[in-house]
Amino acid sequence: MRQSKFFMPTLKEAPSDAVAESHKLMIRGGYIRQVTAGVYAYLPLGYRVLRKAESIIEQEMDNINVPEMMMPHLLPATLWQESGRYQKYGAEMFKLKDRHGRESLLGPTHEETFTEIIAKNLKSYKQMPLALYQIQTKFRDENRPRFGLLRGREFVMLDGYSFAATREQLDQQFDDQKSAYKRIFKRAGVTVHPVIADSGTMGGKNSTEFQAPAAIGEDTIATNEKGTYAANLEMAKSIDTFKQEPEEAKELTKVATPACDTIKKLAEFLDVPATRIVKSILYIADDQKVLVLIRGDKQINEVKLGHVLDADDIHEANTEDLKEITGSEKGGVGPVNADWADKIIADETVKGLYNVVVGAGETDYQFKNANLDRDFKVDEFADIRTANEGEPDPVDHLPLKFTTSIEVGHIFKLGTYYTKTMGADFLDQNGKAQPVIMGSYGIGVTRMLSAVVEQHLTDRGVAWPKEIAPFEIHIVQMKMNKEDQTELAEKLEKKFSEKYDVLYDDRKERAGVKFADADLVGAPVRITIGKKAADGIVEVKRPTDEKAVEMSIDELDKFVNQELG
């Protein structure tokens, strides 16, 4: 490809609203251009990277015998209403009506559509296990699209779905997909951690995220140094090392605690450690009033709480509801005589506490010396707390380390979440109707590209991994009016183009402009044709090298083969 004919509008400076380094690089390098908030055009350079990433995915899906197909972008609302996700998905869904008033949506994901097709076309256990996938543009009406391709309203995604007759088949499909995803990310050059994750609105109870460590990441993952434990902070577990020595139960005493609206203020006012305080927070779970208890030095993890309550709508009670239900404002709520609560759930940190401080059910008042069972009851204990960095992990008891990261993939064991609702049944070996068992698998392809850039930035540009680099070799000719340089450049272009993607900079530009653009292209091998061309000597540089190295043509062949294979 001749650079003089290649559309690559580079910029010296990134737009002021670009925050993420990957966003800046992709704008400056002429990879993408914004059309509107959260929507981007992929220019030739960016589209080459995208297609190479898609090619890796296609190859790895072929390797596990998963065929590709294509679903429509425009979906009928009735399918999502049938699954129950039409309202649950919320404002992120692009909804529209046609001229006849029929409701439709732009697909943010395709579980319902695949399930409907399977329900109509898969009838026997003999047709399973089966898996399908597509690579397609998705649409989500993000409230705050930002960071370029990391959080957009339109993005390219691999979404795959598996269909099984037994749990054993699903487990094997899940493992096959997980292994394929690891290979995809490795080939794309992005470092990832597979972590325990929340399934969110996707449904199902078992899922794994693939998180790419990056400073701009919006997620936090908890890992140990051995790599034997990794979880999204939303689901991370840790060992609570605090132990209170047993005490004789003291008399329950009501005390005034004016203006103590935080645990810190309350602890200072009563001269007790936060571990002597039990926080009480009222949640509304569907129509149930649930009082949630946790030790004062810990924080409630609402994702974990959601799994315990298993309700469609869970939210903390507002000030008005709190006063009406409990008779107290926030801080005074407590578990003693809490007959108004439909259920009391406590974090495991509340076990083994003696003579603690709890809300007295009245604004600005607390009970001292409250004891479990004597003064209040708990219906259920569960791990509903947020893990803290440095706490021991639950596997090897090593300190947890927190890292910001980008979610680039997510795989789910959906089970029968969709198939039961949508009537996707098959006949088993005994001729009995059973719901198909599903899995769901996704990679944010355009998001993955941003993650690659974040992990492979250089001082001047980017160092693309060879399998997704827009060009593997970049030939840069210094003087276009020098015949010896042109002759050598064209010779190398012809030779290397037989095996590699080659960009030949044949522009009549200054050396500084050419080198600056080459840094933004980030080809694994840059070959500069300069004043020693007549002697068969070129300069070779990788994006991460400080300086170029002179080589003969014979040495160049060996170097290219070593770098690119």
Swiss-Prot record:
Q: Name one GO molecular function term.
A: transferase activity
Superkingdom as given in the UniProt entry: Bacteria
Q: Which family does it belong to?
A: Belongs to the class-II aminoacyl-tRNA synthetase family. ProS type 1 subfamily.
- Please give the chief subcellular localization of this protein: cytoplasm
Subunit and partners: Homodimer.
What is the protein name given in its UniProt record?
Proline--tRNA ligase
Q: What does this protein do?
A: Catalyzes the attachment of proline to tRNA(Pro) in a two-step reaction: proline is first activated by ATP to form Pro-AMP and then transferred to the acceptor end of tRNA(Pro). As ProRS can inadvertently accommodate and process non-cognate amino acids such as alanine and cysteine, to avoid such errors it has two additional distinct editing activities against alanine. One activity is designated as 'pretransfer' editing and involves the tRNA(Pro)-independent hydrolysis of activated Ala-AMP.
**Which BP terms does GO give this entry?**
prolyl-tRNA aminoacylation
Q: What class of enzyme is it?
A: ligase
What's the name of its gene? proS
Under HAMAP family, the record lists: Pro_tRNA_synth_type1
List the keywords (alphabetical): Aminoacyl-tRNA synthetase, ATP-binding, Cytoplasm, Ligase, Nucleotide-binding, Protein biosynthesis
Q: Which InterPro entries match?
A: aa-tRNA-synt_IIb (IPR002314), aa-tRNA-synth_II (IPR006195), aa-tRNA-synth_II/BPL/LPL (IPR045864), Anticodon-bd (IPR004154), Anticodon-bd_dom_sf (IPR036621), Pro-tRNA-ligase_IIa (IPR002316), Pro-tRNA-synth_IIa_bac-type (IPR004500), Pro-tRNA-Synthase_IIa_type1 (IPR023717)
Q: Which Pfam family would be a valid example here?
A: HGTP_anticodon
Q: What cellular-component terms does GO give this entry?
A: cytosol
Question: What is its subcellular localisation?
Answer: Cytoplasm
* Coiled-coil zones: none
E.C. designation(s): 6.1.1.15
Q: What is known of its domains?
A: Consists of three domains: the N-terminal catalytic domain, the editing domain and the C-terminal anticodon-binding domain.
Catalytic reactions on record = tRNA(Pro) + L-proline + ATP = L-prolyl-tRNA(Pro) + AMP + diphosphate
